[in-house]
């Protein structure tokens, strides 16, 4: 058996509410929209990981999602320009990432990061 894909499923009464955050700001493509489910993604090959955490590191809560970007400072500027409140950071962490926490429109805590 070979795992082909891992999908994060996030429950929400309004599946399109995440569009401005994930599509407009982060630039993910809408791969599927059935009204009750909207799937965001990219045609680029990405590494998939599943993390099991007791804490978020540096005294932070465990985020619902972690999204690695190529330029965390550009992502921070885009989030702030779109009016999303930054809840932590930006911070250069001792394990080699620069990151910040932001809440998406669904109230989920998202860790946006880049490796240094």
Label each PLM-derived region with a short phrase.
Residues 29-62, 109-114:
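Conserved short beta-strand elements that form part of the metal-binding/catalytic scaffold
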Residues 14-15, 65-109:
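Vicinal oxygen chelate
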Residues 14-29:
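Amphipathic alpha-helical segments
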Residues 1-17, 46-47, 63-65, 115-116:
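N-terminal beta-strand motif that seeds the catalytic metal site of vicinal oxygen chelate
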Residues 27-33, 86-89:
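Short secondary-structure junctions
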């Amino acid at each position: 058996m070979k795992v082909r894909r891992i999908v994060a499923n996030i429950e929400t009464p309004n599946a399109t509410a995440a569009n401005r955050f994930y599509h407009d700001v982060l630039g993910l493509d809408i791969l599927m929209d059935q009204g009750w489910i909207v799937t965001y993604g990219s045609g680029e090959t990405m590494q998939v990981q599943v993390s099991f955490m007791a804490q978020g590191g540096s005294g932070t809560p465990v985020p619902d999602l972690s999204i690695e970007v190529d330029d965390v400072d550009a992502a921070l500027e885009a989030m702030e320009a779109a009016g999303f409140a930054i809840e932590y950071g930006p911070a250069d962490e001792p394990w080699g990432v620069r990151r910040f926490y932001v809440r998406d429109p669904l109230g989920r805590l998202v860790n946006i990061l880049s490796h240094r």
